[in-house]
């Protein structure tokens, strides 16, 4: 049973009483990247978001849709910045990613990567258990390109350090892809055209929509 179904179950079972609910559930956040962005800034943002807390936040980036004109370049930029991330502990210097919460969670990440590759995605880097940290719940952050929406990594909440990227042609197509999920927690848009921002803001179906950045609130951590 997925976390969304758990929430629905609680609501059904509590329907006979007068209770107020505030659910902390999962997400499958889409990211739309338009061609007028600063590629270095967006790549750095993606890598920081997906390696901070080892990607274990419910509002994290899950499906990254990149306009096809900049898709190859952004994939390269993300790979470049991902190579600078080291595995380690919070007190280590530099850009460091720690472990996942446990080995079960880590093994699920490896399964998602393996499923994506078998389904046609390309693993650019990562997605392995490092020898130096074999005893912990560490994995190298994974960059997957040419992902499709039918893969598990697109359909399920990732909650870990996997970066799945795929191209799109038009903004209408990207918005349709973004909304193709049972989740609706967070969505993200990177672009500077005012009309496109307005279109994305009106069209994306989520509890919160971030424009040219990411963040969190006490209601949606």
Where are these regions (language model features)?
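C-terminal segments
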Residues: 50-52, 117-118, 122, 127, ...
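Short, conserved phosphate/pyrophosphate- and ester-handling motifs at nucleotide-, phospho-/glycolipid
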Residues: 67, 161, 193
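Conserved glycine-rich beta-strand-loop-beta hairpin in the small C-terminal domain of fold type I
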Residues: 95, 136-139, 156-162, 181-185
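ALDH superfamily catalytic-core signature
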Residues: 4-148, 171-172, 177, 211, ...
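Flexible low-complexity scaffold tracts in large eukaryotic assembly proteins
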Residues: 1-2, 161
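Active-site donor-binding acidic/aromatic loop of nucleotide-activated sugar
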Residues: 164-166
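Cytochrome P450 core scaffold surrounding the K-helix E-X-X-R motif
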Residues: 150-155
């Amino acid at each position: 049973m997925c976390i969304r179904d758990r929430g629905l179950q609680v609501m059904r079972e509590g329907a006979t009483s007068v209770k107020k609910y505030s659910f902390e559930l999962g997400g499958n956040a889409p990211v739309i990247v338009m061609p007028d962005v600063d590629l270095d800034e967006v790549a750095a943002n993606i890598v920081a978001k997906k390696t901070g807390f080892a990607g274990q936040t419910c509002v994290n980036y899950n499906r990254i849709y990149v306009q096809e004109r900049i898709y190859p370049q952004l994939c390269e930029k993300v790979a470049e910045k991902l190579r600078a991330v080291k595995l380690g502990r919070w007190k280590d210097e530099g850009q460091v990613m720690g472990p996942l919460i446990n080995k079960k969670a880590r093994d699920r990440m490896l399964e998602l990567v393996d499923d994506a590759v078998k389904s046609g995605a390309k693993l650019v880097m990562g997605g392995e258990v490092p020898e130096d940290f074999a005893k912990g719940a560490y994995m190298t952050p994974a960059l997957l390109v040419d992902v499709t929406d039918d893969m598990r990594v697109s359909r399920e909440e990732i909650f870990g350090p996997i970066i799945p990227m795929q191209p799109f042609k038009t903004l209408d197509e990207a918005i349709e892809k973004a909304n193709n999920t049972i989740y609706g927690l967070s969505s993200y848009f990177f672009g500077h055209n005012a009309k496109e921002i307005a279109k994305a803001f009106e069209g994306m179906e989520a509890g919160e929509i971030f424009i040219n950045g990411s963040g969190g609130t006490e209601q949606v951590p």
